[in-house]
Every structure is written in structure tokens, then in C-alpha cells.
């Protein structure tokens, strides 16, 4: 972490980077050094949510990775994060992006879009965009 902090400082990059952190302690480490930095925090379950919540890092400094989908298991966490003004991100890269056919991927993307994530991370953003356009019609 120290090397990353040194690089951010050297490049004066705190205003235009977002760091992914996996624990509240990591979030606090970077926040203490760069109070305006944006952090992508892990909040896939209650344990991770609580770890971030007690870190003392302001909610305004966070977006939250909630897993590969928004579902019954994490919906309450997503709602709680939203109540704090935190945008929630899911990642389809390790799941839907790996499906062999574009039609299958499109169908899965539409399922995720229906859960209203704030951010969708994908290795095939053009296909996610096509699904977003199709859903909007």
C-alpha cells in the first residue's frame, strides 16, 4: 500500500484515481493520506459492509462493489449503501462476459439491468450498452 500511496503522491494523482480496496483498514489507510480520494470498497456481504462502515471513511468517498449481481442476499446491503449515498457496482466480467454467445450474454445483461445497479463493470462494455439501449425502448 505504501508504494501505491507514494506513486499517487509523486504523480499528484489523488484527484483522478480510484482505488479498489478490500478491507476497511485499507480504505482508512488511503483516506488518511488522501482525504478526497475515491475508493471502490468491497461490500458483498454483511461482514464486508460492517468492516467498511466502522472504518471512519466518509461514505462520499466510496462506491461499493456488491458482487456479480444484485439479488435477495445482498439487496438490503445495496439499499443501506444507497441510503448513505453510495453508488453500487456489480461486475459481469467473471460471469456473463464469459458466456459463448452474444445472445446469451445479452439476456444475462438484461437480467442484471432489471435489478437497477448504479454501475456495471464489464470487459465487453459495448454489449452492455446495447442491452441498456434495448431495455430503454
Where are these regions (language model features)?
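Alpha-helix N-cap/loop-to-helix boundary motif
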Residues: 19-22, 70
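Distinct, well-ordered alpha-helical segments
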Residues: 1-10, 26-41, 46-57, 100-103
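Alpha-helix C-cap/termination motif
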Residues: 10-14, 33, 83-84, 115
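Active-site catalytic pocket residues across diverse enzymes, especially alpha/beta-hydrolases
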Residues: 11, 34, 132-136
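Alpha-helix capping/helix-boundary segments
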Residues: 25-26, 127
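Short active-site oxyanion
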Residues: 12-19, 37-39, 116-119
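Secondary-structure boundary/capping motif
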Residues: 1, 7-13, 20, 78-82, ...
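C-terminal active-site rim and adjoining tail of enzyme catalytic domains
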Residues: 42-137
Amino acid at each position: 500500500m505504501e508504494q501505491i500511496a507514494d506513486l499517487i503522491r509523486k504523480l499528484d494523482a489523488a484527484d483522478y484515481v480510484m482505488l479498489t480496496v478490500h478491507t476497511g483498514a485499507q480504505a482508512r489507510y488511503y483516506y488518511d493520506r488522501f482525504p478526497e480520494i475515491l475508493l471502490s470498497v468491497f461490500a458483498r456481504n454483511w461482514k464486508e459492509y460492517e468492516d467498511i462502515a466502522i472504518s471512519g471513511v466518509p461514505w462520499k468517498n466510496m462506491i461499493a462493489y456488491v458482487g456479480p449481481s444484485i439479488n435477495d442476499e445482498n439487496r438490503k446491503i445495496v439499499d443501506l449503501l444507497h441510503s448513505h449515498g453510495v453508488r453500487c457496482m456489480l461486475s459481469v466480467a467473471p460471469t456473463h462476459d464469459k458466456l459463448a454467445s452474444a445472445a446469451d450474454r445479452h439476456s444475462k445483461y438484461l437480467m442484471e439491468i432489471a435489478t437497477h445497479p448504479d454501475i456495471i463493470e464489464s470487459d465487453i462494455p459495448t454489449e452492455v450498452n446495447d442491452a441498456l439501449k434495448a431495455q430503454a425502448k
